[in-house]
UniProtKB/Swiss-Prot annotation:
Keyword Hydrolase: no
Sequence similarity: Belongs to the TRAFAC class translation factor GTPase superfamily. Classic translation factor GTPase family. EF-G/EF-2 subfamily.
Organism whose genome encodes this protein: Treponema pallidum (strain Nichols)
Cross-referenced InterPro entries: EFG_II, EFG_III, EFG_III/V, EFG_IV, EFG_V-like, EFTu-like_2, G_TR_CS, P-loop_NTPase
Protein name per the record: Elongation factor G 1
Subcellular compartments: Cytoplasm
């Protein structure tokens, strides 16, 4: 069986928005005979890219959900995940990387390493995913793959080396030179399907020698055999490839390829590179946590006969019902077999088992180690682990960022109200960064997400997929409250209303802590608060920190210590001590010098150098702090930290200030103390809102 697994490659295609990765995926499908005609991304031909199967994606020309597809190339099975390039959809990238064994990092030959490339690089490192890089758009004006390869080394600190040189650039791009086989490759025919090998043109010989020497010199660090052969002048293609493969799998080397997906140049050698240099499932160490042994890490095997361990990494509710995308790590999932959902503690039977090819599906009878398959009708959440037999393993949970923006939505009519709840139920299951709840005070439905575009897409999906019209309020920032000093409390909760009353006294102090939201410390001695009521105190304090009294947002960074108290043999109860804890916290809170924290975003603005001054001005106007800036002959990039509250409508202002030539991305960086003026206006706004609600 391991021979079959060794031909598997699970790869993701990751990049900055508009680097051309969906176009690249489309060409991969075409050359691997998955589709029989090439469609462009923005749907000029009325079809749209195959991998962009959601109607909204085809219209906007951005990839929102990671479509999964399986292709065959020269005896290898490649599972391709096309991931979104927009920061608002980062959870999709995170989820697909969690189940991949390798990645193709796509870069634009003109723009080079951009802000989202840096985010993707950080994610690849987090999940230890080896990568190769493809410098796309070498046919564009200003294309410079040499500069981009240098940026990979300088900006991302990668040991990146060109494996190919372009033959011509911009509108004169003809093909590529393979630095290992020392052949010129030309892509002929209407769709570049025929690859013609030819001798290297004379004018490129000097460059070929220079870059080949650099490549072998770097690769020989991973192979003593290659180092010796190189000194003796007897190096072979096989030795070089083996050394590059070893360095790539160890995440210490990044082979760089170039071409133009749009012009059908360089895709077949990239497919070869995926099979040559990226690991198969047996070459990747995957671990699970044994829940029966205090979450002790366990290394999984790729034995098809072992008990099943699989991860449900994506949920999708399409025209066929709920689909759960699953990566099989160990054992074989068979149709009709019984599996156990470790989180939900429930067994279920595998009904229909399919393989998804974008939005097409094929029925299969089993999924083996290293495979990515989809299950029908399984009630689960994204990130659930499925096991067979007596295994009680959980795959390490995926990192899920907290939402930073919220929006109130109001259905326009009764029918829409019913559909909204269905839509929200589905979306929150599909996407852990999209959340919804009903505000108990205003009774409004609130949705939360990673940015304006993120929420826009879900509102649009409600309209299209559920035919429900909603009115949206102003976007709201997810503020937090915190304390900046220690304060004592000594609070008695006493209620006598005939019959048994309520009594509980708690004393202690609250103080600020760094690095966590809440900590409870029990220093009660002598049983002045009976042991059974200590959890009640903890529960009461947890309730109190859910909503601060300054502006009504959760309180973070608080340690609560209780060291004294009193109980009554009849009147003390769970509810009495919960109420005492809530009262005690509120008593101490104002004395602990509370402050408002606001989310600070990491903002990257990229555009022509001539607009750099305007960009600095826009950031300064928004209370932003420039962290770094870089520029070359044409482009400049400004990295800044800006409060989220100042970023609403930024895209419109940026467009008008830069003639539409600059773009920006942002992601959550940290919480920071809000200036006094901002705090005062938020407090005033909150007090007015409370008064209005009480009328």
């Amino acid at each position: 069986m391991s021979r079959g697994i060794s031909t598997f490659r699970n790869i993701g295609i990751s990049a900055h928005i508009d680097s051309g990765k969906t176009t690249l995926s489309e060409r991969i499908l075409f050359y691997c005979d998955r589709i029989h005609a090439i469609h462009e991304v923005r749907g000029k031909d009325g079809v749209g890219a195959t991998m962009d199967n959601m109607e909204l994606e085809r219209e906007r020309g951005i990839t929102i959900q990671s479509a999964s597809t399986q292709v065959q190339w020269k005896g290898h099975t490649i599972n391709v995940i096309d991931t979104p390039g927009h920061v608002d959809f980062t959870i999709e990238v995170e989820r697909s990387l969690r189940v991949l064994d390798g990645a193709v990092l796509v870069l634009c030959s003109v723009a080079g390493v951009q802000s989202q490339s840096i985010t993707v690089d950080r994610q690849l490192r987090r999940y230890h995913v080896p990568r190769i890089s493809f410098i796309n758009k070498c046919d564009r004006t200003g294309a410079n793959p040499f500069k981009v390869c240098a940026q990979l080394r300088e900006k991302l600190s990668l040991n990146a080396h060109l494996m190919q040189l372009p033959i011509g650039l911009e509108d004169r791009l003809e093909g590529v030179i393979d630095l290992i086989s020392l052949k010129a490759l030309y892509f002929e025919g209407e769709s570049g399907a025929h690859v013609r090998e030819a001798p290297i043109p004379e004018q490129y010989q000097a460059d070929v020698k220079k870059y080949r020497d650099e490549l072998i010199d770097a690769a020989s660090l991973f192979s003593d055999e290659l180092a010796e052969a190189y000194l003796e002048g007897t190096e072979t293609d096989q030795l070089i490839r083996a050394a590059v493969r070893a360095g790539t799998i160890a995440e210490k080397f990044v082979p760089v390829f170039c071409g133009s997906a749009y012009k059908n140049k360089g895709i077949q050698p990239l497919l070869d590179a995926i099979t040559y240099y990226l690991p198969d499932p047996t070459e990747v160490t995957n671990t699970a946590l044994d829940l029966d042994r205090a979450e002790e890490p366990v290394t999984l095997s790729t034995d098809a006969d072992a008990p099943v361990v699989a991860l449900g990494f994506k949920l999708e509710d399409g025209k066929y019902g709920q689909l759960t995308y699953v990566r099989v790590y160990q054992g074989t999932i068979k149709k009709g077999a019984e599996l156990f959902n470790v989180r939900a503690r429930k067994k279920f039977k595998v009904g229909r088992l399919v393989r998804m090819n974008s939005n097409q599906m094929e029925d299969i009878s089993e999924g083996t180690p290293g495979d990515i398959v989809a299950l029908f009708g399984v009630d689960c959440a994204s990130g659930d682990t499925f096991c067979s037999g007596d295994l009680n393993y959980a795959m390490t949970s995926m990192f899920v960022p907290e939402p930073v923006i919220s929006l109130s939505i109001t259905p326009k009519d009764k029918r829409s109200a019913d559909q909204v709840s269905k839509a929200l139920n589905r979306f929150t299951k599909e996407d852990p960064t999209f959340r919804s709840f009903v505000d108990p005070e205003s009774n409004q439905t609130i949705i939360q997400g990673m940015g304006e575009l993120h929420l826009d897409v879900y509102i649009e999906r409600m309209r299209r997929e559920y035919k429900c019209e909603v009115e949206t309020g102003m976007p709201q920032v997810a503020y937090r409250e915190a304390i900046s000093a220690r304060a004592d409390f000594n609070y008695t909760h006493k209620k006598q209303t005939g019959g048994s009353g309520q009594f509980g006294r708690v004393a202690g102090f609250i103080e600020p802590i760094a690095g966590q939201d809440y900590e409870f410390v029990d220093q009660i001695k002598g049983g002045v608060i009976p042991n059974e009521f200590i959890p009640s105190c903890d529960k009461g304090f947890r309730t109190a920190v859910k909503k601060g009294t300054l502006i009504g947002f959760p309180i973070v960074g608080v340690r609560v210590t209780i060291n004294d108290g009193q109980s009554h043999p009849v009147d003390s109860s769970d509810m009495a001590f919960q109420a005492a804890a809530i009262g005690a916290f509120r008593e101490a809170y104002n004395g602990a010098k509370p402050v408002v924290l606001e989310p600070i975003m990491r903002v990257s603005v990229e555009g022509p150098q001539e607009f750099q001054g305007s960009v600095f001005g826009l950031i300064n106007q928004r209370r932003g702090v420039v962290v770094s800036s870089a520029d070359d002959e044409q482009f400049s990039r400004v990295d800044a930290e800006v409060p989220l509250s100042e970023m609403f409508g930024f895209s419109t202002v940026l467009r008008s200030s830069t003639q539409g030539k600059a773009e920006y991305s942002m992601e959550f960086a940290k919480y920071g103390k809000a200036p006094q003026g901002v705090t005062d206006s938020l407090i005033k706004e909150y007090q007015e809102k409370r008064k209005a609600e009480q009328r």
